[in-house]
């Protein structure tokens, strides 16, 4: 797999798969170790003025069903505070395709039908609407799912982020 530092990602739309599966207690991130581990890659992309769409999962929701207890909303809030910038939470693939935000996060990828089965259609939904797919979800690298495997094959370019590179 190529490395992030090998690609020109300046001003490109980047899909960034992270492992932000962190414990949430009373709506607040209880342990931000995984969030902090993602900052090197995120800061690199921000400095390059890439348009970043973050993908991650939280827990094990019933696929295709929204569960407010497993929403990434607290993660977005915590990450926004860490970076000192606003991050919007988007809830649909249409928003994923259409977004022009500097940085946003797609709601829990496991809410989307086809993630765990490595659905070709979900992988295409992810990979076809970005310029570069950066995989930096070391904790999920063993899973053959749409966002951890399929999208890498579909995206025009894909590479490892700094956490996976290490």
PLM region descriptions:
Residues 1-166:
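Active-site loop-to-helix "anion-binding N-cap" substructures in soluble metabolic enzymes
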């Amino acid at each position: 797999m190529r490395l992030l530092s090998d690609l020109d990602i300046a001003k490109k739309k980047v899909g960034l798969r992270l492992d932000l599966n962190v414990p949430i207690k009373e709506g607040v991130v209880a342990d931000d170790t995984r969030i902090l581990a993602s900052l090197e890659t995120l800061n690199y992309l921000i400095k390059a003025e890439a348009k970043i769409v973050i993908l991650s999962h939280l827990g094990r929701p019933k696929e295709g069903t929204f569960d407010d207890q497993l929403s990434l909303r607290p993660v977005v809030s915590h990450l926004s505070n860490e970076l000192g910038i606003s991050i919007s939470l988007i809830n649909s693939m249409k928003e994923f395709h259409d977004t022009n935000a500097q940085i946003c996060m797609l709601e829990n990828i496991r809410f989307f039908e086809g993630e765990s089965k490595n659905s070709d259609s979900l992988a295409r939904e992810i990979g076809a609407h970005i310029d570069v797919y950066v995989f930096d979800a070391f904790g999920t690298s063993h899973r053959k799912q749409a966002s951890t495997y399929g999208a890498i094959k579909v995206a025009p370019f894909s590479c490892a982020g700094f956490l996976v590179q290490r």
